[in-house]
């Protein structure tokens, strides 16, 4: 890393001139962009001969030269001589001819050589000049080594057992002998380079330099920042750690810290005493987390942030709820009692619960809102949810740069290094439609994962190395130095405010108990836990410190301990009086105003006026004058206008009418996912690109009216897990919005299965949290193989909370039955087959008096299918979503003669229409589409069954028998038919382990086999049939 053979070859005159021209630009004000350009030009010409130009010394030399240009006497005489030689025309190697070299064992020898006659007027003694430059470079390299590698030998482990970076060796570049320096040089004075702020003086002795570097970089704080590519950011961090006395706290600040440590520590001790056999995932061993979070909030509030969204795992959660959010202690303690819930929902364990509280921040004297997002035990899954929530809050507040809204994410060391969603979430950091302009990450680094040693749980030196990918500064800090923790938290808050980038605070700590309080850690970590038993708490150590410093006396300490003990006991007594638990006390995203004056069983019409339809399609089919549109898209847009005239609108028009009508009503619409701007199947084209002007775009749906709701359509990163989580978090903030995530193919949605299972399907039941998120999952068997055919509808249907048996004696169809079903369901599962129905479904998501997630199996081939069209009247006022679409052809005119009543869902309907015609069964077989699978339309299915009393009931599907909707619909249809002694039969593919065949021939044979079963005809009658 530090090779003088690369670094000590100083710049050529051409390089010096490039620096001079850059430094003189704009009245001697350094301009970063011209400087970078000049560097590139200089390097391009001489990089082969000047390898140091890619090294760290180039920046150092430039800084020295710029300083010399302003004032030659401000640099050491050796540099003054060198620059004068170069200015006089000395070429590379002529200003001095003997660059020193660094050897691991030894010396920086400098061979004597006469300087050339390039600048006789300014020639100094050769050996003295070269030796002096060599000394300065040694010091610069030494300081840089501590800045770069000092964290590797920092005293970070409060137990004194491990090295936080899993390596107990000392980097050789941190040894004086690496630079040919030794004891004899300790009292020599050296000029400090401009890349350090360790002293207000221009020079220090080597002894003082080493002392300061070790104090800054090798004690209880390890600072990782030299991987940052921005010199301004590096200097910013240096100033906040290297400047003398910068980390000191006042007596008042120390007292605040002490009181916060009391609350954090005594809260856990109190719970352990009252409920010794309860799991609570306490914070013992990292009690400083509470003061750390509070310091981040205090500093950020002072800097203008008024809304904080916290995502965290289970460890320490109760403590955060009690001492950061200030949720009433009695409410928290009542969770330890066995009490009946007072309201709906299944609830969740106490260490998963969320909360949203507004209160006065005493340090900033400003009101702040703090939300802790409820989450499952699936570690790190909450990260993107928090980021989406922050982004949405900032959007609705008009806080474009997130100056007032911020995420604080807490992590465990093993999960932070091990869970892929962490990197997926980091990757959203700087994406225009996803950035939250910086989050503060706090890692509770227990140095263990459940029972797994860090050496078995990660391949990187630190658990935080994932943050280096996106340029995070990383501050490692020993929790036994609470004051260092406070300083780091202040810097983190200031960094986020200044640069709008993520920052990581790594609290190196330990876990005093096992993974939970009932776990025995000595089984697997005996030596660590022997040491832990001998280790005092951070509170005890800090108490001794402030007493020794005279910050507080024994009486003050005793009073503070007694005061908080009394608060806990009082809360405990109040908790004993609680007779029930209210799940609503734990809402992380309350919508109180939304539910007021709304009839939960009234579903408004979703149709719109004719003139509105014409206006939206008119805009959707046009583009501005002077915009250079692709010729192919010109035809597409003209086609949209023609569809309106022909009274036959396609899928893209149905989507556009849903979005456009909501936008005109002031509703915010957000569509996110891979390739959604164009659409995976090139049907949407909501963002038009000028063919001649780069980055010039036009979004017709954002140009409908003034004012209107904002339409955000954004291509996402190639991630399902993080992006779906992000959109879920976004949907939680404001119910008056339509938030949609579209998978590239429905098959890929299972990459986000954790979000689907733990948040979307069960979120309302566990956390009383509603969401109107829509998931569009392209689905359909078209011979494209096992990974491009199925969105796995069976899985989504299996997670529906609806009973598969219905008591016809107790259920009254009609009236509010449909609304009641929607109110009670955990989510809506639909497979729409017409543009009008997808339009109504999307609008219904916003017009309903409550919010439910919707899983929609969207089409692929139907996007352009000539039969998959809807007339304009199907969108007009008075029209609504059709839960089923009954047969309207010849069979419906003569029901007694119908031999088979076939229920189906999705694209297969159009395949069966073609097959029915092919085999001549147009009068004998009625085809009914179930558009909404869940809640199941019992009432409408019953009507169809009674209409065709003599018909055989068939369920037909293109999916295999062990997939698709069959296992879901069979018991439901049969519960309706049982009273008549009838039952439904299956027609479709046989069971399979793979969703679909990858062979086109096999696919066609399966299609024909299925159709022969549906229509009861020999397979031979389907020769020549193509679906």
From Swiss-Prot:
Cross-referenced CDD domains: TPP_E1_OGDC_like
Residues holding thiamine diphosphate: 315, 413, 446, 448, 674
Cofactor: thiamine diphosphate; Mg(2+)
InterPro entries to which the protein is assigned, alphabetical: 2-oxogl_dehyd_N (IPR032106), 2oxoglutarate_DH_E1 (IPR011603), DH_E1 (IPR001017), KGD_C_sf (IPR042179), ODO-1/KGD_C (IPR031717), THDP-binding (IPR029061), Transketolase-like_Pyr-bd (IPR005475)
UniProt-recorded Gene Ontology molecular function terms: metal ion binding; oxoglutarate dehydrogenase (succinyl-transferring) activity; thiamine pyrophosphate binding
EC number: 1.2.4.2
Keywords tagged on the record: Glycolysis, Magnesium, Metal-binding, Mitochondrion, Oxidoreductase, Thiamine pyrophosphate, Transit peptide
Disulfide bond sites: none
GO terms for cellular component: mitochondrial matrix; mitochondrial membrane; mitochondrion; oxoglutarate dehydrogenase complex
Pfam families: 2-oxogl_dehyd_N, E1_dh, OxoGdeHyase_C, Transket_pyr
GO terms classed as biological process: generation of precursor metabolites and energy; glycolytic process; protein folding; tricarboxylic acid cycle
Highest taxon of the lineage: Eukaryota
Catalytic activities: N(6)-[(R)-lipoyl]-L-lysyl-[protein] + 2-oxoglutarate + H(+) = N(6)-[(R)-S(8)-succinyldihydrolipoyl]-L-lysyl-[protein] + CO2
UniProt key word Metal-binding: yes
Cellular localisation: Mitochondrion matrix
Function: The 2-oxoglutarate dehydrogenase complex catalyzes the overall conversion of 2-oxoglutarate to succinyl-CoA and CO(2). It contains multiple copies of three enzymatic components: 2-oxoglutarate dehydrogenase (E1), dihydrolipoamide succinyltransferase (E2) and lipoamide dehydrogenase (E3).
Description of how the protein assembles with itself and partners: Homodimer. Component of the 2-oxoglutarate dehydrogenase complex.
Listed name of the protein: 2-oxoglutarate dehydrogenase, mitochondrial
